[in-house]
């Protein structure tokens, strides 16, 4: 996957996960989808690609107009940490 395309995709997943975690009640399907999204983001964050994307962002090698919240030092870490708390309070209901 191309770097810019990957960052855009991860940014989209990042935004979707943040929004979904604010919902106090969700269907089992929505909860499963959120878990899968978090798993993809976690794998990205712990892998070489995030480190390279972050380094390239710090070196100003990425387009200035590229949305990059997923590359902030704390953004993705906080989302993954917030997930640990959110999954204890989200009510799953059909």
Where on the chain are the PLM-derived regions?
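Long, low-complexity or tandemly repetitive, helically biased scaffold regions used
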Residues: 9-15, 19-29, 36-94
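Extended alpha-helical interaction scaffolds
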Residues: 3-4
